Amino acid sequence: KKKVIKLNGSPYDRIIEHIGKLPLVLSTPYDSDLIRETSEVRRKWIDGCIAQYSQEYLADLMVYNRILSQRNALLKSMEGHLNGSNSSLLDTYDNQLITMSKSLSQVRADFVNMFIPFLSANEGLIVFERETCSMTYQSQVLAVDFERTFLESRKKDLVTQRTNVGSHKD
């Protein structure tokens, strides 16, 4: 049976249309995973928060992930060998990922900067008395030489058959 989500009795054509309609971020004991787990867990949390207020960001993130998937599939099919047509397609994917990485990472950095005052104001609810909490966003994408770093990683990408640099690695 197909999952159906409705608002005021009207079903959405796509479930993604519901995201952001009820802007809510839930805090649970699992949030400690944000500290203990990998950067992927933290990225997903940030992405989920931003998606609550920016449909544009969510749409861009989905496009980025689709292009990333296509690039990774191409890298796998190339089996470490670069030829003319594959090189041209890889260039196209690279240009799109470089541009989108910069945009996505900047929105994430802006979110973290906007979230820090809320975190500071509510620190007492989050941590024990002798502890403090802080938050920073570190991204290779926001570095001045990101485009060069991305392009220089192509040899490694061909060997590993996946994209090793971009906003999906923040």
What are the residue ranges of the model-derived segments?
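Long, non-coiled-coil amphipathic alpha-helical linker/lever segments
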Residues: I46, Y53-R108
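Short C-terminal domain-edge/linker segments immediately following a structured domain
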Residues: I35-E37, Q55-L58, R66, V165-K169
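Arginine residue identity/basic-tract feature
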Residues: K2-K6, R14, R36, R42-R43, ...
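Conserved NTPase motor "head" modules and their coupling/switch loops across ABC/AAA+ ATPases, GTPases
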Residues: H81-D170
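Nucleotide-state sensing region of NTPase/ATPase domains
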Residues: K1-V41, W45-Y53, Y57, I116, ...
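Charged, alpha-helix-enriched surfaces in structured cytosolic catalytic cores
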Residues: E17, E40-K44, A59, R66, ...
